[in-house]
Amino acid sequence: MTRPNSARRLGAHASRAARLLPLFVSFVLLIVPLGAARHALTFDDFIGLDVVSDPQLSPDGSTVAFVVTDYSLEANRGNNSIWLVGVTGGEPRRLTAGAGSDSQPRWSPDGRQIAFVSDRGGEPQIYLISLSGGEARKASSLKMAPANLCWSPDGRSLAFSADITWPAKLGKEESYPTRALIWDNLMYRHWNEWRVGVRSHVFVISAAGGEARDLTPLDHDYPTLALGGNIDVTFTPDGKRLAVTANLDADPAVGTNNDILLVPVDGSDAVNLTKSNPANDNNPLFSANGRWMAYRAQLRAGFESDRTHLMLRDMTSGQTRDLTPDWQLSVGEILWAPDFAALYAEVEEQARSVIYKITLDGKREKVVSKGNNQSPRMTRDGRSLVVVRQASNQPADLFVIELATGTERRLSNVNEKALAELEMNPAEDFSFTGAKNERVHGLLVKPPFFDANRKYPLVYLIHGGPQSAMTDDFHARWNYQMFAAPGYVVAMVNFHGSTGYGQDFTDSISRHWGDYPYEDLMKGVDHLVATYPFIDGSRVGAAGASYGGYMIYWIATQTKRFKCLISHDGVFDAESMYGATEELWFPEWEFGGTPWTNRDLYMRWSPQNYSQNLSTPMLIVHSQLDYRVDLSQGLQAFTALRRQGVPARFVYFPDEGHWVVKARNRRVWWTEVLGWLEKYLKQ
């Protein structure tokens, strides 16, 4: 239910002088040297932390291009800039600067220039910049923003995807223009945008500039709107075709049948390479010699959280085999070894992302086990990996890891000065026996300046998905350190249904939304209070988003043990949620059918049907543009609470979707959330 591969880290540069002035005054009064000062994370600190993402290695493997994002409350938007750093180290240098936001850096095959997307001229366009110096050159004149940017192997052209009006002539009455939308099919909106009269298509354009040519002029979205990989548009090594992920079903709202198509650059008909699999295929990745195409596949149609297998297709014979047939874990981002004898895969395991080496005969070896590692990139000699690494007390930065020795070296340290002033504790692991008599794992973060002799309130964070997990990361939105900073112990339990603990564990939540996870969460509180004497079991609050928001509603109707609750974009009534969500395969899998074919399960697990039990004070957050869990879910819950006299507060964002991402709105979000916790947990 949470959007995959879309979490963005947001930050802003607040005035350093403005932040340090009150600290300076207080520390002078205490006669403490300013240089020794450390303080708990504040919102201004949080929004001021830069974010590192999207590392791209140069063709010779010597240099990493990457994106640094900073956010501004004044501008209420993020600004991306592209930076370069040598793999052997050195000071990173900024490649792009100016008023625009620059992203998607992609090296030309000869390594002499970088293509990227920028809105410096107004609408986002493709630009090229030479590594030898000079200004960036605009290479496109598009009406809508390009995405999925990639170079042809000969460096002469670029492929990308972009939204277009579809059909080209909608036949609207223009005598008296209106904003009316008319549709006949499902998937009329997705995530946070309306898709009526819009399609995403794949284009190719000369690197020298000119008109873009549509390679997919059909009534489908290329690449797919949902459940894609980190790469869903890529050239074949000979440059004659593009591999594109798309769902060609007549009604993509009810199925997960993404396929990988070979789309000829000359405009001839595409070939479906994965037609035999009715489930999700994505993320095509060719070996440079052209013999192999690796990709990811799920095998159960309609189940978005099925185990993701690593597949290998022989491009000569057409034979396909599964390299991970007997594994319980899912394969994330993948990359080829330089000798084409193995692939490397990012794999979520026990609340962290590790890196496995998987040979073409299916043998597996964990080669990076430390830390939480994303976006792996391999050096040309195959000896090292560049990764984006983060932890609950460490925002993302670039690291290079030598595979033979495990030696690590930091390549970027974009928040070094800011972090030196902050007091943040690392996440600690814990586990207990939960539902089905199975081990359940969690993370705990202590407040800054922790004193084991004190008693602290507990803030219990519940993840969405529900097939997801709370991981050891510096979360862009539900940041553990922000919750801990006012003086709370923060705990997260990866209940039955969570990812990273084997597919059987993940599967267990489907059709069991209110029993196994709820049992885990209640036993988790029992374990925490019994195990950690510094937790005050009489002052416990809980907060969750999406499925986590659903669980908050469920908890509110099942127990009175919490002092206060916070639900963000939660499901209150599963039956009415079905009629307003866009990806219908999700509730149909989770509840075993539609509301008219399996209504009993929708009724059984809907908190709305137990509204008479509501009594715990609750803060509800919901936004107008949330098309995953419609705004009406939050309104129904608020009505049920207030009609029965239960203290409640509603925070509404007219310009946000399932996530609150705009800088100023995030400020409001944190003010309200922390204020609610303080009101009920600090008494």
Residue ranges and their predicted role:
Residues 56, 159-161, 168, 179-184, ...:
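Non-catalytic accessory segments flanking enzyme active sites
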Residues 61-64, 111-115, 155-159, 239-243, ...:
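Hydrophobic beta-strand positions that form the internal "hydrophobic ladder"
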Residues 68-81, 96-102, 115-127, 135, ...:
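A flexible loop/linker signature enriched in serine peptidases of the S9 family
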Residues 86-90, 130-134, 206-210, 264-268, ...:
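Short loop/turn segments that connect beta-strands within beta-propeller blades
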Residues 455, 466-480, 495, 632-633:
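The serine-hydrolase catalytic nucleophile loop
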